[in-house]
UniProtKB/Swiss-Prot annotation:
Keywords: Disulfide bond, Erythrocyte maturation, Glycoprotein, Hormone, Secreted, Signal. PROSITE patterns: EPO_TPO. The lineage of its organism: Eukaryota, Metazoa, Chordata, Craniata, Vertebrata. It comes from Ovis aries (Sheep). This is Erythropoietin. Residues 1-27 form the signal peptide. Produced by kidney or liver of adult mammals and by liver of fetal or neonatal mammals. Belongs to the EPO/TPO family. It is found in: Secreted.
Amino acid sequence: MGARDCTPLLLLLLSFLLFPLGLPVLGAPPRLICDSRVLERYILEAREAENATMGCAEGCSFSENITVPDTKVNFYAWKRMEVQQQALEVWQGLALLSEAIFRGQALLANASQPCEALRLHVDKAVSGLRSLTSLLRALGAQKEAIPLPDATPSAAPLRIFTVDALSKLFRIYSNFLRGKLTLYTGEACRRGDR
């Protein structure tokens, strides 16, 4: 195996090492998110965080409510949605979820006795959301999310609600990744393979 044969493998390995840091990876393959193992890794981290906070009472409640996206998916309606509308819903949900995780991180930092394990899960979620945002940009999802000027404003506003505990926030994070994000990336990757 020559040096040229190793270049793609080294770029892929480097991108996996830089993703947990939340750093943009310039040499990353643009369709890396189409590899199901990549998204599964983030889903697993979200589920671990959700499970770690399920039995947590002390230190897991927020002093204020945090706004999060509704993660329920009407599959019948989703399949009939325009690609731009799906992309817009995913981008809006990802942005709101990022704000919620950042707010949870700030509230946890200001807690009287913050648990180091909880802080680690929140930090991983922050890093994961940054990486997912970069991966979706590489997929071109951000371009699809921009509504066309002649498009009818039929897109419904993003449905939201509030949570008051870290366990609920991580449940929303996990559900969003397993639901809307997985549906959107799966379809976007299939469209790109045609």
